[in-house]
Amino acid sequence: MTDTSTPDHANRTALVLFSGGQDSATCLAWALQRYARVETVGFDYGQRHHVEMTARERVRSGLAASFPHWGDRLGEDFVIDLAGYGAIADSALTADRAIEMQANGLPSTFVPGRNLVFLTVASALAYRRGHGVLVGGMCETDFSGYPDCRRNTIDAMQTALGLGLEMAVEIATPLMHLDKAATWALAHQLGGDALIGLIEEDSHTCYRGERGKRHAWGYGCGDCPACELRANGHAAWQNSVPA
C-alpha cells in the first residue's frame, strides 16, 4: 500500500469528476492521496443507471470512514442537474434502448459530447471554488471507442478551458493508459484490500443499473459492456497477484 501521509502537492486542491463507478472511485482515492484538499462533482443527466447517484454517497462516506487521513482532505460534494443535456444527448444510457453497436462504429451507450459538457461545467465550478486541477476517469485503453475519452480530446479541452477561463487548468487522467486490470491494481496500491472491498461492494458500473446480482467484482447484470470490462479486469488482476 502506498504511503498517503503527505500529499505530493501540499498546496494544491482538486475537483474530481465523480460518478460513483469503479474508475471515478479509484480516481478519487488517487486524488486524496495526492492533493491537500479534494472536492467532488457529479452530474444528473437522466442516466438509466441512476443508482450511481446513491453509489456516490456510499463511496465517499466509505472512503472517509476507512481512510481517516483521506477523510480529512475530502471536502464538499456537488451534484449538477444536466437533465436538459440528457434530453438532447439520447443514447442507451438515457433511454430504454438496446445496447448494441451502431453503424458509425460506436456503441449505443455513447452519449455525444458527455465528457466535453462535464469538463466545461466542472471547470466553471472549479473556477469558483479555487481549484486548478480537474481529475477524471477518462481512459483510451478500455473505453469502448468513445472519442471524448481520448487523451488528444482531453488535451484540446484543457487548452480551450484555460483560454476561456484565463487561468491555468490541468485535467489529470490517472487511468488514461491503464486497462481495467491495471485500474484494479492501482486501487490496491492506493488502499490495499480495504479499498478493493469498498469498490467491489459500493461502486456501481453496470449500464442497466442492476444491483440485485453480486459477483466477485461487485454488482451488475454481468453482460453489458461495462460489466464485462469490470469483470474481465478483476479476473485478470487477481490472476496476476502472487499467491
Curated annotation (Swiss-Prot):
InterPro entries assigned: QueC (IPR018317), Rossmann-like_a/b/a_fold (IPR014729)
Q: What is its EC number?
A: 6.3.4.20
Provide this UniProt record's keywords sorted from A to Z: ATP-binding, Ligase, Metal-binding, Nucleotide-binding, Queuosine biosynthesis, Zinc
- Report the Pfam families cross-referenced here: QueC
Metal-binding among keywords? yes
What are the binding positions for ATP in this chain?
18-28
Pathway entry: Purine metabolism; 7-cyano-7-deazaguanine biosynthesis
Q: Which GO terms describe its molecular function?
A: ATP binding; ligase activity, forming carbon-nitrogen bonds; zinc ion binding
Q: How is the cofactor bound?
A: Binds 1 zinc ion per subunit.
Which residues are recorded as binding Zn(2+)? 206, 221, 224, 227
The reply on keyword Cell wall biogenesis/degradation is no
The UniProt entry's sequence similarity note says: Belongs to the QueC family.
Task: Tell me the function of this protein.
Answer: Catalyzes the ATP-dependent conversion of 7-carboxy-7-deazaguanine (CDG) to 7-cyano-7-deazaguanine (preQ(0)).
Record protein name field: 7-cyano-7-deazaguanine synthase
Instruction: List the taxonomic lineage.
Output: Bacteria, Pseudomonadati, Pseudomonadota, Alphaproteobacteria, Maricaulales
Gene that encodes it: queC
